[in-house]
């Protein structure tokens, strides 16, 4: 509620006296309470990594994925309410399909990001609807445009990034991403770093078990968005665990 007055958070169409739209801020809180997702753009593609929390031992492995194929050349990573994210993934797929039907070639990622951002923004304007409780990243690679990465938040704002993080540990993840020389790295290099960052920011006290989801799109995949092969993912996880172990040992030595 507003510090100036109450009742300004009942509708997305109402501003508070200090110029805030509380329903949009609450939607962003839903994203901040979600597991972490990161996207990194490098010289030959884009890599996504998601910390998918396992809330029950009864879940089937691989269920409730947070990485989606939007089009052959576009991938999507989400944080926030999964049902809202699935709905937006369907909207993005429809936009990509309609563009190809009308113009005969793949939709440029900036155009797709702008179109979906407009749709998300429309849900912040009316009292009859609520804002989407998720943020998501879109990544693609083409010979003409190279690697591209965009993030859209619940307010409908879209930005292009070299590296981006969303979810509960986004600040810690961004700090780690900033240490990387992304413009000089390849997808194979970045996959290991993405896995390492997810393991670093994972809160073992509050959230015990999690599955690491990794996907990429780039020269290596011939411009197609694909899940990272199991052997490469396992290699990346091994690298992440060894790096964490080395850091813990060096911290113990310094004490």
Curated annotation (Swiss-Prot):
Residues annotated as carrying N6-acetyllysine in the record are 57, 206, 230
Q: Which UniProt keywords apply?
A: Acetylation, Cytoplasm, Nucleus, Phosphoprotein, Proteasome
The record's subcellular location field reads: Cytoplasm; Nucleus
GO terms for cellular component: cytosol; nucleoplasm; proteasome core complex; proteasome core complex, alpha-subunit complex
Where is it expressed, tissue-wise?
A: Detected in liver (at protein level).
Please name the GO terms that the record assigns under molecular function.
ubiquitin protein ligase binding
* Protein name according to UniProt: Proteasome subunit alpha type-3
Which organism does this sequence originate in? Mus musculus
